[in-house]
Amino acid sequence: MLRANVVVSLVIFAALMQCMNGKENITPWIYSMKQPVSCNREHSEIGICLSGIDDDIQNDGKCWKFCLMVAKSGGYNADK
């Protein structure tokens, strides 16, 4: 029985690794530590800011607008 549990655990682990397909994070709300500290990743007024989507100047992203209008330090908060 223990051997079967180990095999099942390894199969699940391998399946998860395949789903990740080399990506750092498989969930968009978890941010990489390598990213620069940016303006309001999560803010009570605008919600979660998805990197590359909500901060995209070309698509007029909600977080980009908020950072320009409200945030200090030119849109970046060094405190976070």
Swiss-Prot record:
GO cellular component: extracellular region
GO BP annotations listed: defense response to fungus; killing of cells of another organism
Signal peptide, first to last residue: 1-22
Family, per entry: Belongs to the DEFL family.
Domain of life: Eukaryota
Keywords: Antimicrobial, Fungicide, Plant defense, Secreted, Signal
Disulfide partners: none
This protein's name: Putative defensin-like protein 28
InterPro entries: Defensin-like_20-28
UniProt-annotated location(s): Secreted
